[in-house]
Swiss-Prot record:
Binding positions for [4Fe-4S] cluster per the UniProt entry: C116, C120, C123
GO cellular component, as recorded: cytoplasm
Cofactor note: Binds 1 [4Fe-4S] cluster. The cluster is coordinated with 3 cysteines and an exchangeable S-adenosyl-L-methionine.
Keywords per UniProt: 4Fe-4S, Cytoplasm, Disulfide bond, Iron, Iron-sulfur, Metal-binding, Methyltransferase, rRNA processing, S-adenosyl-L-methionine, Transferase, tRNA processing
Function comment: Specifically methylates position 2 of adenine 2503 in 23S rRNA and position 2 of adenine 37 in tRNAs. m2A2503 modification seems to play a crucial role in the proofreading step occurring at the peptidyl transferase center and thus would serve to optimize ribosomal fidelity.
Coiled coil (UniProt feature): none
Protein name: Dual-specificity RNA methyltransferase RlmN
Active site positions, chain numbering: E96, C345
Catalytic reactions on record: adenosine(2503) in 23S rRNA + 2 reduced [2Fe-2S]-[ferredoxin] + 2 S-adenosyl-L-methionine = 2-methyladenosine(2503) in 23S rRNA + 5'-deoxyadenosine + L-methionine + 2 oxidized [2Fe-2S]-[ferredoxin] + S-adenosyl-L-homocysteine; adenosine(37) in tRNA + 2 reduced [2Fe-2S]-[ferredoxin] + 2 S-adenosyl-L-methionine = 2-methyladenosine(37) in tRNA + 5'-deoxyadenosine + L-methionine + 2 oxidized [2Fe-2S]-[ferredoxin] + S-adenosyl-L-homocysteine
SUPFAM superfamilies recorded: Radical SAM enzymes (SSF102114)
A Pfam family that the UniProt record links to this protein: RlmN_N
Length: 382
């Protein structure tokens, strides 16, 4: 466990929350905007560096507040430019954050939980069990750390982080309030100013919270589908037993229709050799998604030890994609990035204190550091 100070962590407060905080300590609400800019635009964690605040206010803030992000354990850089940070959160567990540069975009993949309770059979994170929800400060803190690493100001045109996907460790909708607060900061011009179309939340299908999400925030939605029929999805994504496909897809349709503006649902489908990659599975997907505005992202399986699954051949992947194309769907195949530093989709594991198995040991599915020679470890921890 990481020791707490009892002070209010301003890093995870939205603008309205920060305004209320300043009112509670007898200060004007406009101070919230000043402090948010220092924190998120410039990566400042020292009140003394906030030059437009008077000394008395800086001293008051030092007495009752702090700006504290997760602790960086390691930062690895892949041969393809992908970066991965392993960060330690207050529970003592480690989670992972991945930055993927591609063309003129920079996508940050953010974790929402330490471990995951959903136990999807092909995902290394799920093999750890669940430890804890991340706080709002720990979720947005991953963006804060990455942005500081690049030394860029979010408002600039040449920003490093253009997109954020809640597709890291954990199920975001099972940490609803903290994830929503973090996404609000991401989209706030006083935070990171990221367009609502460029913030995406991925869910395995927590149906009640999909409806709640549509009421409070406008972000893009991705569904981790991975199977085109009930029996197979029950096997691969166990939450399907609680929220079957007809109920789940109806909720997704409601969400997309509320957004309007020609928004579509992203379907994520991990291809597993001999399991869900056959022509009949593609045909079933076409029928299943016939009346849903969507785009399909095929993800060839990224191996990890003892998974029991294999990546399909390139021919099998192309065949699956071609069938979906002929069925009228917009289909892409995700390029595997960061595989040499275990940063590819489905490989994020961190190090999680195993509470679901009621023991006091640590699960370490892999070493926190990459094997020698597999990646360049960054020396700059700022």
């Amino acid at each position: 466990m990481i020791a707490t100070t009892g002070k209010v962590n301003l890093l995870g407060l939205t603008q309205p929350q920060l305004e209320s905080f300043f009112e509670s300590i007898g200060e004007k609400r406009f101070r919230a905007g000043q402090v948010m800019k220092w924190i998120h635009h410039f990566g400042v964690d020292d009140f003394d560096a906030m030059s437009n605040l008077g000394k008395a206010l800086r001293e008051k803030l030092k007495a009752c507040a702090e700006i504290r992000g997760p602790e960086i354990v390691s930062e690895d850089i892949s041969s393809d430019g992908t970066r991965k940070w392993v960060v330690r959160v207050a529970s003592g567990s480690c989670v992972e954050t991945v930055y993927i540069p591609q063309g003129g975009r920079g996508t940050l993949c953010v974790s929402s939980q330490a471990g995951c309770a959903l136990d999807c059979s092909f995902c290394s994170t799920g093999k750890q069990g669940f430890n804890s929800n991340l706080t709002a400060a720990e979720v947005i803190g991953q963006v804060w750390i990455a942005n500081k690493s690049f030394g860029t100001v979010p408002a600039k045109i040449d920003r490093a982080i253009t997109n954020v996907v809640m597709m890291g460790m954990g199920e975001p909708l099972l940490n609803f309030d903290n994830v929503v607060a973090a996404m609000q900061i991401m989209m706030d011009d006083l935070g990171y100013g990221i367009s609502k179309r460029k913030v995406t939340l991925s869910t395995s299908g927590v149906v009640p919270m999909i409806d709640e999400l549509a009421k409070v925030i406008d972000v893009s939605l991705a569904l981790s589908l991975h199977a085109p029929n009930e029996a197979l999805r029950d096997q691969l994504v166990p939450i399907n037993k609680k929220y079957p496909l007809d109920v789940l897809l109806a909720a997704c349709k409601r969400y997309v229709s509320r957004l309007g503006e020609k928004r579509v649902l992203t379907i994520e489908y991990t291809l597993l050799k001999g399991v869900n990659d056959q022509p009949e599975h593609a045909e079933q997907m076409i029928a299943l998604l016939a009346d849903i505005p969507c785009k399909i992202n095929l993800i060839p399986f990224n191996p990890f030890p003892h998974s029991g699954y294999e990546r399909p051949s390139n021919n099998a992947i192309r065949r699956f994609q071609d069938i979906l194309h002929k069925g009228g769907h917009n289909v892409t195949v995700r390029t595997t990035r960061g595989e040499d530093i275990d940063a590819a989709c489905g490989q994020l594991v961190g190090q999680v204190l195993d509470r679901t198995r009621r023991s006091e040991r640590y699960i370490a599915v892999r070493e926190l550091q990459s094997e020698p020679g597999a990646a360049q470890t960054a020396s700059n921890r700022s």
